[in-house]
Design a protein with these regions (language model features):
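A glycine- and charged-residue-rich anion-binding loop/surface
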Residues: 1-332
Length: 332
């Protein structure tokens, strides 16, 4: 960041190329150059200064090393594999997926191969998170879990032609594999499986309809816009449609952007945010309550709590008032 603890850093890179490739091109020239076989596996930051707003550096009284290692990448290097997904971290999950969907993982750059890798990565992440106490939801960290899960569902639905819940069937494989280092998943396997399957069921009910909406835009609305000379609009998914996919069909915005990009479209994110804000405003207005004055019917000076000793008790209404909201009238 612009301010706060900082210091010089060093990175550890490994050249995973063949001897012939190393002789042909010096690995130093490929560091931090997005080469798939020359990878960073470790980073060390030597925290020793505090950077102030004016940019000056103030020495810290206590110094330390902030270190981070890429577990999957280090495993790849130690096991001498060409990809993280060729290591035994993922091969068991990929093999189990092959059996369920009846397709062979080809380890290529095609959509099917990518789907296998997305599923193997995402199902491990969500299963660990749920076992650790984070349930899928529509807000905060819970929504991150839901987004990851739904992205995996979309991949097996669209590219592995599998239309039934799949992820929950992979959990026993992961639980067994990691039982010595993360026993929590194995202990809560039934619960985590139930949560994941319910999430899959819920999204699968709306996924196809949402995908049809995108196809309709491309085949009908998009063609119409091109005919009208609005080529730019034809290649942009409207914010209103993106919000409908989110609100009605459960498509996270990042999933809609992924689907759109695969079809050569962009998403009107500003339009999406506008629709989102309008819905929040409507929701706030709808939850506004109007309360009338209290009406006293029994003048009782005090009451005694008896809940610690009894589950039932007779009582008298002391006072009440009318509460109006969402077109309804209630009394409290």
């Amino acid at each position: 960041g612009d301010t706060g603890p900082c210091g010089p850093c060093t990175e550890i890179h490994v050249d995973c190329r063949t001897d012939e490739e190393r002789k042909a091109v010096d690995g130093k020239t490929l560091v931090n150059n997005d080469h798939p076989q020359v990878i960073e596996i470790w980073n060390n930051v030597f925290i020793q200064f505090n950077r102030k707003k004016d940019g000056s550096l103030e020495p810290l009284p206590a110094k330390h090393v902030d270190t981070g290692m890429g577990f999957e990448r280090l495993t790849r290097v130690l096991q001498q594999k060409q990809s993280n997904y060729d290591t035994d971290i993922f091969t068991g999950t990929i093999a189990a997926t092959e059996k369920i969907v009846g397709k062979k993982y080809m380890a290529g750059d095609d959509k099917e191969s990518i789907a296998f890798r997305v599923i193997a990565d995402h199902v491990r992440a969500i299963s660990f998170a749920i076992a650790d106490g984070q349930l899928p939801s529509n807000t905060g960290a819970g929504y991150v879990i839901r987004r990851i899960l739904r992205r995996a569902v979309r991949y097996y639905y669209s590219y592995l032609d599998h239309k039934q819940p799949l992820l929950y069937k992979l959990l026993p494989v992961i639980a067994k594999q990691f039982e010595n280092v993360f026993p929590e998943l194995n202990k809560q396997l039934d619960f985590v499986s139930k949560v994941v399957k319910e999430e899959e069921d819920a999204f699968l009910k709306t996924l196809e309809k949402g995908l049809i909406k995108v196809e309709m835009f491309m085949s009908l609305d998009g063609v119409k816009l091109i005919y009208e000379g609005k080529s730019k609009e034809a290649h942009t998914l409207p914010g209103k449609l993106a919000f409908e996919l989110y609100d009605t069909f459960g498509f996270p915005l990042d999933l809609t952007k992924l689907i759109a990009s695969e079809k050569g479209l962009k998403v009107d994110e500003a339009g999406f945010e506008k629709e989102m804000q309008q819905q929040k405003d409507r929701s706030r207005a709808a939850t506004t309550l109007e309360t009338e004055d209290w009406i006293t019917v029994n003048d009782i000076p005090s009451s005694k709590f008896v809940g610690y000793d009894s589950l039932e008790a007779k009582a008298k209404v002391v006072k009440y008032r009318k509460v109006s909201g969402k077109g309804k009238e209630l009394y409290q």
